[in-house]
């Protein structure tokens, strides 16, 4: 994919977001992860829309309780035990959101997320972060600190033109 040319060799983390729910960010992040895995890259997709996890439905995961929130709540948890292989491709792995916590923003602000990403970088060629809509909550802005590249999803005849102002502001501020 063209995204590979936008990243340096040591850059592995791609954040996918949108302005509001329903624009297709989970669809795009899932297909991006699948495409990279079909190129022979070892890829993990991380469900960081922890208020409204979408990866469980996309990948038909049965164990919805185990995921990144367990690690963020308790960094003593073995992160790699929470990563699940996918049925799609041997190179594709999924780290779902897990149980919806009472304090999502607080969990994402802690340095546990930074440690999780560093651990995943040791095991995977690419880390795709499926995040919450940026126009709804501040979670994605907090997650942005660990990303090397952001993909902003806009859906034709769905994303309002006024929301493009937010996209331009975020780009200008390099967030």
Predicted regions and their residues:
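P-loop NTP-binding module
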Residues: 1-175
């Amino acid at each position: 994919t063209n995204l590979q040319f936008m990243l340096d060799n040591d850059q592995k983390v791609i954040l996918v977001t949108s302005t509001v729910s329903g624009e297709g960010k989970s669809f795009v992040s899932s297909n991006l992860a699948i495409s990279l895995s079909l190129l022979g890259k070892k890829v993990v997709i991380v469900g960081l829309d922890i208020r409204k996890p979408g990866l469980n439905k996309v990948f038909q995961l049965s164990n919805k309780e185990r995921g990144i929130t367990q690690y963020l709540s308790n960094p003593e948890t073995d992160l790699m035990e929470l990563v699940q292989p996918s049925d799609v491709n041997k190179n594709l792995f999924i780290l779902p959101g897990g149980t919806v916590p009472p304090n999502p923003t607080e969990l994402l602000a802690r340095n546990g997320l930074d440690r999780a990403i560093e651990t995943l970088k040791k095991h995977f060629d690419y880390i795709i972060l499926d995040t919450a809509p940026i126009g709804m909550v501040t979670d994605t802005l907090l997650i942005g600190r660990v990303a090397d590249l952001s993909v902003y999803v806009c859906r034709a005849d769905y994303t309002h033109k006024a929301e493009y102002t937010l996209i331009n502001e975020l780009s200008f501020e390099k967030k």
